[in-house]
Amino acid sequence: MLRYHTSKNNFPLASDLRRQRERMVITQLEQRGITNSYVLTAMRNVHRHLFVPEALQSRAYDDYPLPIGYGQTISRPYIVAIMTSLLEPTPGLSVLEIGTGSGYQTAILANIGLEVFSLERVRELYFQTKELFFLLGYRKIRTCLSDGTLGWEEHAPFDRIIVTAGGPNIPLPLLNQLGDPGVMVIPVGQNPREQELMCITKKNNTVTSTVIGNVAFVDLVGDYGW
């Protein structure tokens, strides 16, 4: 059963939430160097509080991750913004998301105008977000309940791939399903609770990687993960 409320009249007041959302964009994103207009606009448009449990809605725009159940979290706003910016998103590009989770990152990608494919392994989250996307009008997002480390061969290649969980290595199926040219953003690390955020680019059959910084994500579970 869906644990999230989509009514704009729920507590906190809609006007308060709008102010919180604008403050989030200014203080957490713009003042920290996020400049991509697609990302900033999407994070102003998407109501983050609708993607967290009702009891946490008043904290939805704070600068830290929040639990969403089943051992999963919604990433802090800055991490969502930096990962999305690294994708160099342009409307019309296809993107594969590994780990639908709360659905917030998925909605940001869809709001930008990307063609979104999203995989989730936690059954309860898969059905919750599927219903939530329908209620919020995100009818073009395609989701699947499956092992995200295997990718989604049926719809490959993808212009972009974003992985929202950390594994010990870059899953080979994802690298194979990344288009050329293409960009993948993924946390990688041998420590299950500490990874390096990496930006992988593929161009002219050459793959290059850049370490962006240290991050901490939940485990990437699957055949090519933990």
Curated annotation (Swiss-Prot):
Catalyzes the methyl esterification of L-isoaspartyl residues in peptides and proteins that result from spontaneous decomposition of normal L-aspartyl and L-asparaginyl residues. It plays a role in the repair and/or degradation of damaged proteins. This is Protein-L-isoaspartate O-methyltransferase. PROSITE patterns: PCMT. SUPFAM superfamilies: S-adenosyl-L-methionine-dependent methyltransferases (SSF53335). It comes from the Bacteria. One of its GO terms (cellular component) is cytoplasm. It comes from Lawsonia intracellularis (strain PHE/MN1-00). InterPro entries: PCMT, SAM-dependent_MTases_sf. Its EC number is 2.1.1.77. It is found in: Cytoplasm.
